[in-house]
Amino acid sequence: MSTARTAAARPLVVSADEELLDDLLRLLAAAGTEPELATGGPALRRAHRDASLVLLGSDALTGGVLRALPRRPGVVVVSGRPLPPIGWAAAVEVGAERVAVLPEDEAWLLSRSAAAAKI
């Protein structure tokens, strides 16, 4: 497998929530993958385009930076608590295929992350 292919297969994590980041990094390590972290600018646009899976922390939904990104498959919003209605609306707006609430959805997210790592 080439380096370019390996880099493209990395999941993207977008969040500034340190507790959520710790949980996601642990979970992604268990899935056998190392994510790319980005919060804005050209790095976010490139990583969003190339990532095998995009994990958006619920904290990232409130910023306008995600609105400029094109919709794509493989976007999951991740939160440490159930989302309020405005959070669900924002998840729909960014085209999320699912909202995963940790720790309840950890097994599903682990499976989804492992599957994306094989792409």
Please name every model-derived segment.
Residues 1-10:
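Non-catalytic signal-transmission and effector/linker regions of two-component phosphorelay proteins
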Residues 2, 23-52, 56-63:
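A short, well-structured beta->alpha microelement
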Residues 104-113:
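C-terminal output helix
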Residues 61-72:
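Short amphipathic alpha-helix used as the core "switch/output" element in two-component signaling
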Residues 73-83:
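A short, hydrophobic beta-strand element within the central beta-sheet of small alpha/beta folds
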Residues 82-98:
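Alpha4 helix (beta4-alpha4-beta5 surface) of REC/receiver domains from two-component response regulators
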Residues 115-119:
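The C-terminal output helix
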